[in-house]
Structures are given as structure tokens and as C-alpha cells.
């Protein structure tokens, strides 16, 4: 059973993707690592209107693609670990324990916990501090997915992280990731930020793009396929933490040198 680690990095996160690959190798847990970047994406994906917003890097459309692409090349039963390049990897013993869970489950997804104060309102006073999905999904996405649910209880569940995902290659998981990719590819309107004229509910805080789509899908499948949903342990510092969502942007060697020379200049000047 192969264990493969992947990440993606482009533009500001290119150096971070190189750094996290070295962290992954140093853990001596993964049999293979792969770093994707923009040039690895197919032209059909690059032509998506989601890539017109350079600030959001394609609204993370590349994420389900790189996961599906890697899964497609693995054998049945192999394990794929995806992490955002801004994260930091640690604790090899903790990784061994976490991956043991895949003996009985086909995937591990991480949800924001009801018992932690994420202080979302510090970023924007209009944001609700609750991680419930109803606050983090625009109306058009809610309305699109609602018909497949029996009621609206799924919106009272917490949103999932899309920054760390652990998946075993099985037919069910290939189906789920392909559907995630298809929704983001063929319905970019459900992924992008709501337009100014689109009315949102009073409880709406912000639309979370790839995370919102993934959350809706996994909340539908959680009692239909063999997956595990756990409270995340990557935000802030925790004992036995295996991933920290530090959102780290590593400087290139060139920028590090520029910063160093700039600091020397100011010391001499003063």
C-alpha cells in the first residue's frame, strides 16, 4: 500500500510548495511526493473563468484536479495525502497513528470544531464566529444542493477544511473527487464570490469557494460511504499535531537576499 503526498504551489506559494515537499520527505512516512504547479494543469482547466481572478489563484479549481489526477495514477487501496503548501508538517509518529485509521476508512476529512474559538470576526466584523455551513455558503450553492437532502439539517453542520485531505483510492472516493472537480469545472458560478446584486441570507458571512462545494458534497455522502470526519487539529498549536495551518508564504532565496541587504543598508544609514 503506497502512501503518496502531494501539494500545489504557484506564484507567491511556489517556494512554500518546495519547502513542504522537503518536510514531507523528512518525515520518512510517504513513499512518494509530488509538487504540482500551474504549468502542470491542462489547458482546459486554465481556460476556466475562475482563473481570471489572479488573487484567488483560480478559486482553488486546481485542488480537486491535482487530487483526482494523483488518485488516477495510484493503485486500488493506495493512500493519497493532500496538504496546502502554506501548511507545515510535523510529528511522524502522529502521522503513523492517523494513517492507521485508513485501515477501516476510505478517507479522512477535517471539520472546524464547534468547541474552538476561531474568531472569524477578527478578520471581518460582519463574519459570524460559528463554523456552521449556513454562514459560509452563498445562496445559489445552497439552493443547488438542497434538493438532494431530505431537510436543511446539513446547513447546521460545520464546514470542512479543504487544506488537508487524506484519501484511500477506492471507487467511491474516485467518484466523490471527480464530482467535486466536475462541479467546480462546469459550474464556476457556484464557486466564485456572489455578485453584488445576488441577495444573501442575513446569516451569511462569506463564500468559501472550493471548501464550500466540498463541504456540501461530503455532508451528503457522510452516511452513505465509508469516510471519517474529525475535528481539525491544524489551526493554532496542539499536542501531537501533525499539520499546522500556518498559511506560510516562504520567500525565495532572491527575496531573502534582498531583505538581508535592505536590513544592512538601514543599519549603515542609521
Question: What are these language model-derived features?
Answer:
Residues 1-270:
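Glycosyltransferase catalytic domains, chiefly GT-A lineage
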Amino acid at each position: 500500500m503506497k502512501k503518496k503526498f502531494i501539494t500545489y504551489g504557484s506564484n507567491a506559494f511556489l517556494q512554500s510548495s518546495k519547502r513542504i515537499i522537503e518536510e514531507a520527505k523528512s518525515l520518512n512516512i510517504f513513499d512518494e511526493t509530488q509538487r504540482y504547479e500551474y504549468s502542470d494543469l491542462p489547458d482546459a482547466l486554465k481556460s476556466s473563468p475562475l482563473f481570471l481572478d489572479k488573487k484567488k489563484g483560480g478559486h482553488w479549481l486546481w485542488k480537486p484536479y491535482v487530487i483526482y489526477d494523483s488518485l488516477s495514477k495510484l493503485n486500488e487501496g493506495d493512500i493519497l495525502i493532500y496538504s496546502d503548501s502554506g501548511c507545515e508538517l510535523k510529528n511522524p509518529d502522529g502521522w503513523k497513528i492517523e494513517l492507521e485509521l485508513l485501515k477501516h476508512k476510505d478517507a479522512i476529512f477535517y471539520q472546524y470544531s464547534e468547541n474552538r474559538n476561531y474568531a472569524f470576526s477578527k478578520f471581518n466584523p460582519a463574519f459570524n464566529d460559528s463554523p456552521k455551513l449556513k454562514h459560509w455558503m452563498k445562496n445559489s450553492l445552497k439552493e443547488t444542493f438542497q434538493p438532494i437532502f431530505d431537510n436543511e439539517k446539513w446547513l447546521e453542520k460545520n464546514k470542512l477544511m479543504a487544506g488537508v485531505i487524506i484519501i484511500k483510492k477506492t471507487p467511491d472516493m474516485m467518484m466523490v473527487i471527480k464530482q467535486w472537480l466536475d462541479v467546480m469545472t462546469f459550474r464556476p458560478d457556484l464557486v466564485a464570490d456572489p455578485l453584488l446584486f445576488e441577495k444573501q441570507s442575513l446569516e451569511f458571512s462569506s463564500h468559501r469557494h472550493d471548501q464550500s462545494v466540498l463541504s456540501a458534497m461530503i455532508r451528503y455522502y457522510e452516511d452513505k460511504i465509508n469516510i471519517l470526519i474529525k475535528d481539525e487539529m491544524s489551526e493554532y498549536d496542539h499536542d501531537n499535531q501533525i499539520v499546522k495551518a500556518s498559511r506560510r508564504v516562504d520567500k525565495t532565496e532572491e527575496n531573502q537576499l534582498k531583505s538581508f541587504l535592505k536590513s544592512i543598508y538601514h543599519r549603515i544609514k542609521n
